[in-house]
């Protein structure tokens, strides 16, 4: 720090909204650096003479939420809310081939997660960050056990301009859930409308991404899992988790605090 180790004398910022145009400008030498290049273009950029790709994982986890509070899905056909049953939620989980999404949609530039946080965050527990296996047969059996042997209908709400390949991920999920009889209609729209309607409790089944700028698990629990929290749109509520959140806010002993966080992760 303090020692000049570059040859930059001036920086000009040139907003280029269209991703393809940004990449073309880079490859033609019109500009020197681009940010947020499309994942499908990274190999082409990397193989182009004089260009180098630098990447690092985002501090954000993308997940699909299911409203467990309403008695009847707004977009369903069963007259009730299948998401109230753990077996149904687990069935959808195990019907999603996360490795296929990583390989085909994200071109290898994603990391499957078992919890909504990541290494480096205070309270992260590696043992809990393990996913159940992708298993279509097990998912079908779980649906049958829950009383939905023929599946059901539901709408999946996604943004199409907020996260990397957000709509493409949702499109892949639609096909995967169809294999277990869950007929998903995709409703993708601009982020401004998506988040406003989600805040207004209009989503039965939705995509959301959550970062942890504080690098502390409390940020996740306070906004996503605390009873009545502003972004707790799955309407999860558990007195033990709420009590653990109070411990996170007041406990100064790190070992005790991390134990409370780990216990909360086990519950959710």
Where are these regions (language model features)?
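Ligand-binding "clamshell"
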Residues: 43-57, 200-203, 216-231
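Structural transition elements
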Residues: 94, 111-145, 162-167
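Alpha-helical secondary-structure segments
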Residues: 7-10, 28, 59-113, 140-142, ...
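Extracytoplasmic/peripheral linker and loop segments enriched in polar/acidic and small residues
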Residues: 86-94, 102, 179, 183-194, ...
